Design a protein with these regions (language model features):
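Beta-rich, blade/repeat-based domains predominating
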Residues: 25-40, 67-86, 91, 112-130, ...
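Blade-level signature of beta-propeller repeat domains, shared across WD40, Kelch, NHL, RCC1
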Residues: 270-305
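Short, conserved, GDST-rich strand-edge loop motifs in beta-rich repeat architectures
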Residues: 132-151, 294
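Blade/loop signatures of beta-propeller domains
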Residues: 1-21, 49, 209, 301-305
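Short loop/turn segments immediately following the C-termini of beta-strands
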Residues: 47, 87, 135-137, 193, ...
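A short beta-strand motif characteristic of beta-propeller blades
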Residues: 19-24, 59-65, 105-112, 165-171, ...
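A short loop-to-beta-strand structural motif that recurs across blades of beta-propeller domains
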Residues: 51-53, 91-93, 154-157, 197-199, ...
Length: 305
């Protein structure tokens, strides 16, 4: 049984008998999925493998970039250009949509003259601003390059529309990881791997955030060695929060009620909706890539127009 419901409300979002289909395997640690609607393909990262790959129905899995600077989270801007969090360079970069690395430009690499830790996950707002988390995972062996940390905190940042120096939004996370907007962008959700919880903030008109509070906690152990961690996170079109955690993808209501879990047979790193009607949930999980049919879609993002 792949769907374990704590509330019948979950079955409005995903069928009780939904199949978890493995569509690729043989990787090291998969992350950062992003669906390209113009080309009808999914890009995803393999950090320890230092590789970026592509999946589509015709060709299945192909390699598009190796090395990839151990890229992690990815998204697209309104023009369809790929935005990548790179662990090796401690940078947020933008490149051509195919992910091969052409047209690469650095959007953020330092804060107040100090190197960022290792940008992890990223989201683009409708005004063109880019928000990203900056934990230290990419300064650990395997997931990046082991090296000393220059900043003395782990923050969440905003790159203003049109570019510019990153603006610090919050600095009191232990390891900020997944982040996502509510459908109307009035709220920003950020999870903290070490604290095993999700916090939600109000978005202000100037791009800052306020009134941070815990939405849900107890999502995993916070222990990196256990692999039972809160990680990637997305909102669907109705405002439900889907987040990776122990044993699969956990689903919460906008008020924080736990609805249940879509069980995945490997440790899960992230998730993203895609496919012709945006109802397929793609789930990279350790050595494999999975997909699940849902009854909902991801929130409407700028690149979907």
């Amino acid at each position: 049984m792949s769907v374990r419901a704590e509330s019948d409300q979950l079955h409005e979002l995903v069928d009780a008998n939904a199949e978890v289909e493995r569509i690729g395997t043989g990787f090291t640690f998969t992350e950062g999925p992003i669906w390209n609607p113009r080309g009808n393909f999914l890009l995803f990262s393999d950090m320890p493998g230092d590789t970026r790959r592509r999946w589509d129905e015709q060709s299945c899995i192909t390699e598009v970039a190796k090395p990839s600077n151990k890229g992690n989270g990815m998204t697209l801007d309104a023009e369809g250009r790929l935005i990548v969090c790179e662990h090796v360079t401690s940078s947020v970069v933008r490149m051509d949509p195919d992910g091969t690395g052409g047209g690469r430009e650095v959007l953020a690499s330092h804060y107040e003259s100090k190197e960022l830790n290792s940008p992890n996950d990223v989201v683009v707002a409708s005004d063109g601003s880019i928000l990203f988390t900056d934990p230290t995972f990419g300064r650990m062996p395997g997931f990046g390059i082991e090296r000393a940390q220059e900043l003395d905190f782990q923050g969440v940042y905003r790159i203003p529309p049109g570019g510019g120096d990153p603006q610090l939004l919050v600095d009191d996370f232990v390891q900020p990881n997944g982040l996502c907007f509510s459908p109307d962008e009035s709220l920003l959700y950020i999870n903290d791997t070490d604290r095993a919880h999700i916090r939600v903030f109000d978005m202000e008109d100037d791009g800052s955030i306020s009134k941070g509070r815990v939405l849900a906690d107890g999502i995993g152990t916070g222990d990196l060695e256990s692999g039972e961690l809160v990680d990637g996170m997305k909102c669907d079109e109705h405002g439900y929060v889907w987040v990776t955690g122990p044993k699969g993808v956990w689903i919460f209501t906008p008020s924080g009620e736990y609805l249940g879990i879509v069980e995945i047979p490997e440790g899960v790193g992230n998730l993203h909706w895609g496919g012709p009607d945006w109802s397929w949930l793609f789930v990279p999980a350790t050595t494999s890539l999975y997909r699940v049919a849902t009854k909902t879609r991801g929130r409407r993002e700028p690149f979907m127009s």
